[in-house]
UniProtKB/Swiss-Prot annotation:
The keyword Cytoplasm applies. Its main location: cytoplasm. It comes from Halobacterium salinarum (strain ATCC 700922 / JCM 11081 / NRC-1) (Halobacterium halobium). GO terms for cellular component: cytoplasm. Pfam families: Salactin (PF25229). This is Salactin.
Length: 362
């Protein structure tokens, strides 16, 4: 909406006359597990995140339907909370509507600026219908009156990993997005995607399922945990550098409690994830990249491989991936990730949004 037409009295653009001052830059990632928004100064952004879920309940006095979202919904209404983007994208009209309602509630509760330029970090998934539904959610959203743009999640996540500015937009490198619902790999050449690859077989959610199964096996069937608890075990205890067994207590059906200790379940699951991710990258993605863009393949592997997504938060996973991939392809490689990988995509999107505002591209 960049319009430089001036009037006779003030010299203000049509956009400024309509909206006022410069729009606020926002970076947004609406993920399958978490939604993250970065705003304010890109050098030190304010980051807000919540679980991508909602629940409804009827007011006990008026019968009016109310909506709650995020951790509050997951904790208070575990029986009917809806994670509407479990597969990474909305699957039908119902989940699209739920996602719209969730984002409206989230934006309102957190005071997100409607007079804004918004950059969304979106997944690289071969699902045109799902991407169209995601676009509908974005376009109908409560923010981004000046401009809405979208960039690949792995590119956005690489931005804070490769410098303080937007160096990632000028570099040639490989990014691996280790998300809840997909493992994505892509080469970037000055922001252009090359040989994008995605699989739903190697995911953070699959790690959660394995942890739940392995906990049951390790406790000889005495403990059954849900996927939310398995995810919490992973996030709180998985550590390639300094893992320590941990204990938990459950309430038994007949009364009383049972205390148990987990030795291997969590690390077995994340160890298998790294092996599977390395195998897919080394034996599927990289050969395809080399076949189509051999010079880009060579140049990209001379630069650090950027790991993004929630699984990148596990301490030591970057060096573990680096070592195993190097052994698999018989070549020295370097891997890196941003600080706080779980929010990196939103923070990178925010930097892009701020640059668009600075350039007047709205």
């Amino acid at each position: 909406m960049s319009d430089d037409t001036e009037d006779d009295s003030g010299g203000e653009s049509t956009a400024d006359m309509e909206f006022g001052e410069q729009p606020a830059p926002l970076g947004v990632k609406v993920g399958s597990t978490r939604t993250v928004v970065a705003e304010d100064d890109a050098d030190s952004p304010s980051v807000t995140q919540t679980l991508t879920c909602l629940a409804t309940y009827d007011d006990a006095l008026t019968g009016e339907e109310h909506v709650i979202y995020g951790a509050e919904a997951a904790t208070e209404y575990p029986d009917r909370v809806r994670f509407m983007l479990r597969s990474g994208l909305p699957e039908d009209e119902e989940t699209t509507g739920l996602a719209k309602r969730f984002f409206e509630e989230f934006a309102s509760a957190n005071g997100l600026d409607t007079d804004s330029v918004v950059v969304y970090a979106i997944p690289t998934i071969d699902n045109e219908a799902g991407l169209d539904r995601l676009a509908e959610i974005i376009e109908d959203g409560p923010v981004g009156e000046r401009r809405i743009a979208s960039y690949p999640e792995s590119l956005c996540g690489a931005v804070p990993a490769l410098g303080d500015g937007l160096d990632a937009i000028e570099d040639t490198f490989v990014a691996i997005n280790m998300g809840s619902t997909n493992l994505e790999a892509c080469a970037y050449r000055r922001g252009e995607q090359l040989a994008p690859f995605s699989t739903g077989a190697i995911t953070g959610t699959e790690v959660d399922r394995r942890i739940a199964n392995y906990v049951e096996e390790e406790t000889q069937g005495r403990v059954n945990i849900d996927l939310t608890t398995a995810r919490e075990y992973k996030e709180q205890h998985a550590d390639f550098n300094d893992y320590e067994p941990f204990s938990d207590i459950i309430q038994q059906p007949g009364g009383g409690t049972y205390e148990f200790t987990i030795e291997d379940a969590v690390m077995d699951a994340v160890d298998e994830f790294v092996d599977a991710a390395v195998d897919e990258v080394a034996n599927v993605f990289l050969p395809d990249l080399a076949s189509d863009y051999v010079k880009i393949y060579q140049q990209a592997l001379d630069n650090p491989i950027v790991l993004t997504g929630g699984m990148g938060c596990i301490p030591g996973i970057v060096s573990e991936f680096e070592t195993r991939l190097g052994e698999e392809i018989d070549r020295e490689v370097e891997a890196t990730t941003a600080d706080e990988p779980e929010t990196a995509a939103a923070r990178g999107a925010h930097r892009i949004a701020e640059r668009l505002v600075d350039l007047g591209e709205y």
